Amino acid sequence: FRACYRLWLSYRLAIFPIGVVMELYEVMRTTFAARDFVDELVSDEALARILDNARFAPSGGNRQGWKVIVVRDDATRARLGELIEPGFQRYAAQVQAGEAPWNTINASAVSDETVAATKLPRGFVDKLTGAPVVLLVFVDLSVVASFDSGLDRIGVISGGSIYPFAWNILLAARNEGLGGTLTTFVGAQEPVLQELLGVPSHYAFAAMIPMGKPVKQLTKLSRKPVSEFAVLERFDGAPLVD
């Protein structure tokens, strides 16, 4: 038994150094959308550890079509902020009108004039682009399966081959004492973003992840209970739990 334990321990420590291993459920329940960061560098070594573990996310056919661009350059950050603002402005205007923003089911009644007049929260965009490091995540559409491509609605299935990876990045960052948030505001300007970063047209933007050490680590998040979303056998079935 001792020999087996020593073998297991040596394997565990080879992957996760002492002092940085968190319990899985704790990581899942305390990884929050961090947007306020201390002025502290995120090293390339920390990023490499994060991505080295995030890469074990599943993807369709194990094709692993992700590409991550690490942005630190101030000029690029500034341009990202400019690209974020139009989409975020429309988002904010629709939220203020009580709508689900950028929704493909319920058409927006918010006019372009109202959108243009909507003021953005002070400093919000700067928090995203001014994080210690910004990751841009893209997915190669030439390798993902899109089983819903023929349906008369927005496609979502391709996301199954990229968002587990993006979420793994945030989970791994939490384990490193870091944090971030998955944002998609800049996606509305994808062609310009592709040109800015030299991204081929068949790579779709999936997420922008500002990352750093949070000013405050939240440990108690609010989410719906299981009884509100898990049912038995049918959409209108009985709750899985009371």
Where do the model's predicted regions map?
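Small-aliphatic-rich amphipathic alpha-helix that forms the alpha element of a beta-alpha
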Residues: 50, 54, 133-196
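C-terminal helix-cap and adjacent tail motif
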Residues: 26, 30-34, 204-242
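A glycine-rich helix N-cap at a beta->alpha junction
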Residues: 89-103, 197-220
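Glycine/small-residue-rich phosphate/adenosyl-binding loop
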Residues: 70-162
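Glycine-rich phosphate/pyrophosphate-binding beta-alpha loops
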Residues: 56-62
